[in-house]
Amino acid sequence: MRRRPAQLTATKLADEEVPELTLVPDGVSRWTGADLDALRNAARRGGAEAAQQDLERKLCRTIDILGARSQQAQEINTVLTSVARLRENSTFRLYLLTQNHRGVGILKVGVKKLFVTHPVTCGLVEVDPLCVLDFYVDESCQRQGYGKTLYSHMLKAEHVSRPEVLAIDRPSNKLLGFLRKHYGLAAYTPQVNNFVVFHSFFDHTTVSERGKLLRAPSPARALPFSSSTNATAAIGGAKAKNWAPG
């Protein structure tokens, strides 16, 4: 059987209606591949409640649909966010915004090693920042403050006090405008890897002899987190999940 092109499959998925997540309170929740695995294992365990099985299926579908819509909105060839991709990299975190028990926005972050051009020395330096890897709010829900709610929650949950220390992967003009409007971030040097790091990213830093960027200790960097807390909560049921930042 001839396989459908991936682009057509993603387009069809983007056109699906986002399912209702009746057990998920409105607000922002954080999910990792480990959380989704724990939820799946709990749903498949003997004696699992039908509601738990329904939650696992609909939550995963929500993530895949919003990821496909993000791809479509950005007009790129690759889906950046999906359940499969979250399971492939256990360090990535997905923040899901729900309103009226339906997913309306996603924000995926993770630490990556990058080589970027320093705006002062013009030389390449090695950095390992927390990166914004995908950010999308459904078109029907834009200009209602949901994007700011989602981004602010992520900053607090990741213990980021200075938004400029994040690196942004291939930001759209709309996202650059969002960052300029809400966080005053504008000046940056174009990078060959298509990540955007703002000039203020380099404030309070030095460069080691080996070319690694060293940042003065501050609460601006994301602190280590444990996915087991979310996984345990997922097994216990959606209502037991820690919905507060951090």
UniProtKB/Swiss-Prot annotation:
GO cellular component terms listed in the entry, alphabetical order: microtubule
UniProt GO BP: regulation of microtubule cytoskeleton organization
The segment(s) forming the N-acetyltransferase domain are: 21-202
What is catalyzed by this enzyme? L-lysyl-[alpha-tubulin] + acetyl-CoA = N(6)-acetyl-L-lysyl-[alpha-tubulin] + CoA + H(+)
What does the record give as EC number? 2.3.1.108
State the top-level EC class.
transferase
The source's superkingdom equals Eukaryota
Q: Where is this site: Crucial for catalytic activity?
A: 74
GO molecular function list: tubulin N-acetyltransferase activity
Give the UniProt keywords, A-Z: Acyltransferase, Transferase
Q: Which InterPro entries match?
A: Acyl_CoA_acyltransferase, Atat, GNAT_ATAT
- Binding annotation for acetyl-CoA: 135-148, 172-181
Functional summary from the UniProt entry: Specifically acetylates 'Lys-40' in alpha-tubulin on the lumenal side of microtubules. Promotes microtubule destabilization and accelerates microtubule dynamics; this activity may be independent of acetylation activity. Acetylates alpha-tubulin with a slow enzymatic rate, due to a catalytic site that is not optimized for acetyl transfer. Enters the microtubule through each end and diffuses quickly throughout the lumen of microtubules.
PANTHER family attached to this UniProt entry = ALPHA-TUBULIN N-ACETYLTRANSFERASE 1
Return the similarity comment: Belongs to the acetyltransferase ATAT1 family.
By what name is this protein known? Alpha-tubulin N-acetyltransferase
